Regions:
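Metal-dependent de-N-acetylase/amidase catalytic core
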Residues: 1-160
Length: 160
């Protein structure tokens, strides 16, 4: 709720007309919550979403939406743009080993679609839960997909 209020104020104060956010895809719970907050800001500016990574179909998918609706813009990156993307990702030193699967050939975005935030982004194992059987694994997060949905549903801005 605090993040929503802060972003809303920044949008209004700075006269921001466009916002980009991660897709609701189960890649990371923070990304999914950011998508929900951005959806609630659609009345203040135009909002676009971009896919990062998901585990739909029990396969790692990058830079592609789980469901295509025809409004997607796909940008094929040239060699210079791919190099820039690689250098940009190297800023995240803590994620160096985690980002090797990212598709460097394209970027994709579309107007933010309306999701059912009361249920996980897709059936099956979400990306951030794929190692959940191994509690000792460093990439395991304790949040269940329904816990994230319940946090969204119980937020003050859910029914706004």
């Amino acid at each position: 709720d605090k993040s929503y209020c802060l972003l809303k104020q920044i949008i209004l104060d700075k006269n921001i007309d466009t916002l980009f956010c991660p897709a609701y895809e189960g890649g990371h719970q923070d990304h999914d919550v950011a998508n929900f907050i951005s959806f609630k800001l659609k009345s203040y500016c135009e909002v676009f979403e971009f896919p990062e990574y998901n585990f739909h179909g029990q396969v790692i998918n990058t830079n592609t939406f789980i469901e295509i609706n025809g409004s997607e813009v796909v940008l094929d990156l040239d060699k210079e743009q791919r190099l820039f993307k690689t250098k940009s990702m190297s800023v995240y030193k803590s994620e160096k080993q985690n980002l090797k699967y990212i598709n460097l050939k394209q970027e994709c975005f579309r107007p933010l679609k309306h999701y059912d935030y009361t249920s996980p982004p897709h059936d099956g194992i979400l990306f951030y839960r794929r190692y959940s059987l191994f509690s000792w694994h460093p990439r395991v997060d304790d949040n269940s997909p329904m816990e994230i949905c319940n946090e969204i549903i119980n937020s003050k801005i859910f029914d706004k």
